């Protein structure tokens, strides 16, 4: 099984287990319950439906047709689009001379916001986006490249017009090295300007690593975060190649572990060496969280272990 410092770090489980581990089932059930309680509470409050009734409706699939939604109070009316004009009129919304209503599309709204930005003051708040898995190196696209994001943060740090920075994080994590590169630049930035992290749907593992130096961290009730933990994967293909394709390997080598790779199982010493690196990253991670959030390391360890939270 892959080396891991955390029993809740479940990303490796599909490769080594036929079903969820007890620890993963525990954390996933609590996450699901937390998310459902938040959603159900909001619906219950907004629509005046008590939680017991809402859970019964959900369990028995009592709302599957528009008429069901109307009956149970999930919607107020069932109308065609053209009938909405009557609703607008009842609400006192003014139409033009042709009886039509002027709608603003999202694109038009964005253009207006851009036009308004021309009148901004000399002092600015920079918004930097960190969206996607965290990977090493430089680049652009659907991932967060460690060196590229660090350079962006360095740029806003050097910009005298920027008085504060908001980092919008929406990431499941990724490379520990890239996360540390970003973390370092966040530390340098924080020393000079206020830094606020705004978490999106998730800011877990490396996503939390890069967030923890911020002066303030803001999350949504449904944000999945935490997962403070580390794992290492080392693929061994020797059995699959031998049993499926009849391919075998032999080698000569200069040193004991010179042949360490996918075509040979790890020796106890090799596994211990990898685990040493995993443990080092985990210790660094938990210490940085303790430092950034001003918490005792023991408190961080209580909520770490790779466990996700909402």
Task: Identify the role of each PLM range.
Residues 1-51, 55-59, 63, 89-194, ...:
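Small-residue-centered hinge/linker elements
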Residues 50-72, 76-77, 292-310:
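Amphipathic alpha-helical substructures
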Residues 75-81, 218-219:
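Short acidic-hydrophobic, aromatic-tinged amphipathic segments that line or gate anion-handling sites
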Residues 77, 85-91:
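Terminal amphipathic helices with adjacent charged low-complexity linkers/tails
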């Amino acid at each position: 099984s892959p080396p891991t410092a955390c029993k809740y770090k479940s990303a490796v489980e599909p490769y080594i287990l036929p079903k969820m581990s007890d620890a993963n089932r525990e954390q996933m059930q609590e996450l699901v319950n937390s998310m459902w309680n938040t959603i159900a509470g909001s619906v219950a409050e907004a629509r005046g439906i008590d939680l017991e009734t809402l859970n019964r409706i959900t369990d028995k699939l009592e709302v599957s047709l528009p008429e069901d939604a109307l009956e149970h109070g999930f919607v107020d009316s069932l109308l065609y689009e053209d009938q909405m004009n009557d609703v607008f009129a009842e609400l006192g919304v003014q139409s033009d001379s042709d009886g039509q209503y002027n709608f603003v599309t999202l694109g038009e709204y964005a253009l207006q916001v851009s036009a308004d930005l021309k009148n901004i003051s000399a002092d600015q708040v920079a918004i930097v986006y960190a969206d996607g898995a965290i990977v090493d190196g430089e680049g652009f696209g659907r991932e967060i490249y460690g060196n590229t994001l660090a350079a962006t943060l360095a740029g806003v740090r050097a910009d005298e017009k920027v008085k504060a920075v908001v980092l919008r994080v929406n990431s499941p994590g990724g490379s520990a090295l890239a996360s540390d590169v970003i973390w370092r630049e966040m530390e340098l930035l924080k020393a000079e300007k206020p830094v606020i992290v705004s978490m999106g749907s998730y800011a877990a593992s490396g996503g939390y690593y890069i967030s923890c130096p911020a002066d303030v961290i803001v999350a949504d009730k449904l944000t999945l975060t935490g997962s403070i933990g580390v794992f290492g994967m080392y693929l061994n293909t020797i059995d699959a190649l031998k049993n499926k394709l009849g391919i075998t390997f032999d080698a000569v080598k200069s040193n004991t572990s010179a042949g360490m790779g996918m075509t040979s199982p790890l020796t106890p010493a090799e596994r211990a060496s990898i685990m040493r690196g995993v443990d080092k990253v985990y210790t660094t991670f938990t210490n940085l969280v303790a430092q950034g959030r001003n918490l005792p390391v023991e408190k961080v360890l209580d909520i770490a272990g790779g466990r996700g939270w909402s």
